[in-house]
UniProtKB/Swiss-Prot annotation:
Cystine bridges: none
Principal subcellular localisation of the protein: cytoplasm
Catalytic activity from the UniProt record: a (3R)-hydroxyacyl-[ACP] + UDP-N-acetyl-alpha-D-glucosamine = a UDP-3-O-[(3R)-3-hydroxyacyl]-N-acetyl-alpha-D-glucosamine + holo-[ACP]
Listed name of the protein: Acyl-[acyl-carrier-protein]--UDP-N-acetylglucosamine O-acyltransferase
Enzyme class: transferase
An example Gene Ontology biological process: lipid A biosynthetic process
Record CDD domains: LbH_UDP-GlcNAc_AT
Primary role: Involved in the biosynthesis of lipid A, a phosphorylated glycolipid that anchors the lipopolysaccharide to the outer membrane of the cell.
Keyword Lipoprotein applies: no
Family classification: Belongs to the transferase hexapeptide repeat family. LpxA subfamily.
Subcellular location: Cytoplasm
Database matches in InterPro entries: Acetyltransf_C, Acetyltransf_C_sf, Hexapep, Hexapep_transf_CS, Lipid_A_LpxA, Trimer_LpxA-like_sf
Length: 259
């Protein structure tokens, strides 16, 4: 039987799994679904049109599925989706999408969103990420998998942040972050590969050394992007599949790569 505290307010159109729990003073609005084992601890607001998966834990004063802050938004029916096994800490805010994009903000699984993280409209966040306290992510941003954003980092609209990258605390991201790179500063600049992150994932020395050489080709050779992609594809990719992450970053970038 679903555990719903007597002080909680839950819409009649909400679908709450029998193993989910809704704590004191929570508000769950229309067209919300909450999956098995998910916990809304206390004082959590899930406004509307939100699908939350399994085994998430959402802490007090989080605002989930609220109307976005885009001035073009005019009350259209848009959505927020959250995957499984996420920890969403105090005062986080996740907004629904806009019809100017895909009408959807999408959060993956196994992420940690620390206190006061903001995810704006139409963002796509992958799996296994850590966003530290007070990170602000503007609209239409795409964050890959296994990314770390340090506290108080800010990300400009439409930026992409590649897999396994590390953004230093307080950084301002104005362009795209290539996969596996370490960036920091205001505005952020690249400072090499996220070597420590690779070691924590138990990547081999051979893999890391190959990626180091690939990094130098991208950032220090002076060659055009087209030349770099061709060389990475022909000379690096056959010996190291993870080079594909760097190639994908270059191919998908619309704002240019942080250098």
């Amino acid at each position: 039987m679903t555990q719903i505290h007597p002080t909680a307010i839950v819409s009649s159109t909400a679908e709450i799994h029998e193993t989910a729990s809704i704590g004191p003073y929570c508000i769950v609005g229309d067209n919300v679904s909450i999956g098995a084992g998910t916990k809304l601890l206390r004082h959590v607001v899930v406004t509307k049109n939100t699908r939350i998966g399994k085994n998430n834990e959402i802490f007090q004063f989080a605002s989930i599925g609220e109307d976005c802050q885009d001035l073009k938004y005019n009350g259209e029916e848009t959505w927020l989706e959250i995957g499984d096994n996420n920890s969403i800490r105090e005062a986080c805010s996740f907004h629904r999408g806009t019809i100017q994009d895909n009408s959807l903000t999408k959060i993956g699984s196994n992420n940690l969103f620390m206190v006061n993280t903001h995810i704006a409209h139409d963002c796509i966040v992958g799996d296994g990420n850590i966003l530290a306290n007070n990170v602000g992510v503007a609209g239409h941003v795409h964050i890959g998998n296994n990314v770390i954003l340090g506290g108080n980092a800010g990300v400009h609209q439409f930026c992409q942040i590649g897999d396994y990258s590390l953004v230093g605390g307080g950084s301002v991201i104005l362009k795209d972050v290539a996969a596996m790179t370490l960036v920091s500063g205001n505005p952020a600049q690249a400072h090499g590969l996220n070597i420590e992150g690779m070691r924590r994932k138990d990547w081999s020395k051979e893999t890391i050394n190959t990626l180091r050489t690939a990094y130098k080709l991208i950032f220090k050779s002076g060659k055009t992007t087209e030349e770099v992609i061709e060389e990475l594809t022909q000379d690096f990719l056959p010996q190291e599949p993870k080079v594909q992450l760097l190639i994908d970053s270059l191919l998908s970038s619309k704002r240019g790569i942080i250098r």
